[in-house]
Amino acid sequence: MSVISILPLASKSCLYKSLMSSTHELKALCRPIATLGMCRRGKSVMASKSTSLTTAVSDDGVQRRIGDHHSNLWDDNFIQSLSSPYGASSYGERAERLIGEVKEIFNSLSRTDGELVSHVDDLLQHLSMVDNVERLGIDRHFQTEIKVSLDYVYSYWSEKGIGSGRDIVCTDLNTTALGFRILRLHGYTVFPDVFEHFKDQMGRIACSDNHTERQISSILNLFRASLIAFPGEKVMEEAEIFSATYLKEALQTIPVSSLSQEIQYVLQYRWHSNLPRLEARTYIDILQENTKNQMLDVNTKKVLELAKLEFNIFHSLQQNELKSVSRWWKESGFPDLNFIRHRHVEFYTLVSGIDMEPKHCTFRLSFVKMCHLITVLDDMYDTFGTIDELRLFTAAVKRWDPSTTECLPEYMKGVYTVLYETVNEMAQEAQKSQGRDTLSYVRQALEAYIGAYHKEAEWISSGYLPTFDEYFENGKVSSGHRIATLQPTFMLDIPFPHHVLQEIDFPSKFNDFACSILRLRGDTRCYQADRARGEEASCISCYMKDNPGSTQEDALNHINNMIEETIKKLNWELLKPDNNVPISSKKHAFDINRGLHHFYNYRDGYTVASNETKNLVIKTVLEPVPM
């Protein structure tokens, strides 16, 4: 049960060839498929259909389970017709000029005509500037300037925090909370005890009962800071509970405004399920509203102008990449397999939502292809394939030799061929950036993944319900996080020598925690639909088995607590001081986890493309922002 459910092929995919190479093979394939209503021709049979499962018996006596998934929502002709004017060189030239102007704004924060800016709020100005460019998704242009600003702020950091300016003796909560979050995310050593100095005699964060905009902003920054917690930081737990409660109450009393929109977004997506591109789009809209109300200064307007232009330039690139993805999907022959979910557009939305660097095209495309392959395998192992067929396929993946697949059913031959060719092609491309062969790493991860799938298929076939620990250890592998992350990561222009892989891949704590979060969160969103498809084993059902008398609510509470603690552990693995593995080497794997978590924030956003998922595709991929 996968929670996830690079190069374009030069010609029609081998799956299509496998389907159409001979009349005999076509009939052999259509016998089971046509009887299940998945081909336009063939015999019909009696079928029983539940809310999310169709079972049918073919005329050769084979009974198969099929998830009742909705079809692809995004027409290929529509995707191929997309166009954008923002790919023109004139827009890129305008962006370069604006980048230079924003760099000058950064520099002016330190000096203006040889004099330092106001000592009253210079620290807050530095932090706000960094916060703005990061939330707007344009920080990649200003890494040097950000480092200078944060070094400056950190030089005034104390155990009691900081004030708004270098000469302000009294520390304030707003600047301290904003500084804590940004400094911690950039690898500076800061401790949460700093927030103890903002408590009253009752041990609570000191604030008035009046919901002033200044106070709300301070508590909002405290909430954002509390989400970057490490294990055992009780102060951060208390800050999160207090600030979340305060902000929810504030929403009931303040009018609808840019501030209320910001609060709603942060409460909804927090940090670990936040997509950077969605945040950029949301923050652009918020600042645009402030512009209409004449609430922005000249510098922020300049930053906003660059953010909108950059958003739309990348939007033009997204359309071209999405066309490539859609062509690959169509040529692969997967649209002819109607028992699988077709979610390539959603996968692309996810990956382009976490990586907006134009040069990382192969990373994005390989992620989409790997995730779609995972989804095909998931649907094949969970529902359509018989246990005997799956045993043959599992053995074939271990052999990794397409010449030895004659024993497979025709539909499996096609799936195997696309899997084999796509993985090998991506490994060849990865060799260019890594300078070595990475196929052995990916094959090992793929074999482990298929093995975990196979074990779950055996459980389904035999009706076995494992213990929680047995299910969870296997489920971390079958979540698909590792295999979805590993191959695309090799496509980056970042070297991943063996000692770095040991820190982010199996069996590292980083990999274990990332897989754990995805398995746990996925099960809380999917367990009811999985049970309807005949998949009894889940974290919920296995917990209840181990704890007789417990309810689903008990199980969900236990698992949600596990998720919260594991997120803190993953935060630590990302941000802990480590000279051997810089944050940049871990960041893409971490952000993939955030993106996948986003799609399971409230529901299974893959299997069922809700209005929220559709709106995400529209807002972050299909539509530009108004200039």
From Swiss-Prot:
Q: Where does Mg(2+) 2 bind?
A: 378, 382
- Motif residue range(s): DDXXD motif: 378-382
Gene Ontology BP, a term? diterpenoid biosynthetic process
Keyword annotations for this protein, in alphabetical order, are: Chloroplast, Lyase, Magnesium, Manganese, Metal-binding, Plastid, Transit peptide
Could you tell me where this protein is found in the cell?
Plastid, Chloroplast
The stretch annotated as transit peptide is 1-36
Which cofactors?
Answer: Mg(2+); Mn(2+)
Highest taxon of source? Eukaryota
The recorded induction information for this protein reads: By jasmonic acid (MeJA).
Q: Which reaction does it catalyse?
A: (2E)-geranyl diphosphate = (+)-car-3-ene + diphosphate
Keyword Lyase in the entry? The reply is: yes
Main localization category: plastid
InterPro entries annotated for this entry? Isoprenoid_synthase_dom_sf, Terpene_cyclase-like_1_C, Terpene_cyclase_plant_C1, Terpene_synth_N, Terpene_synth_N_sf, Terpene_synthase-like, Terpene_synthase_metal-bd, Terpenoid_cyclase/PrenylTrfase
Q: Which organism is it from?
A: Picea abies
Q: Under which name does UniProt file this protein?
A: Carene synthase, chloroplastic
Q: Which gene encodes it?
A: JF67
What protein family does this chain belong to? Answer: Belongs to the terpene synthase family. Tpsd subfamily.
Sites where the protein binds Mg(2+) 3:
530
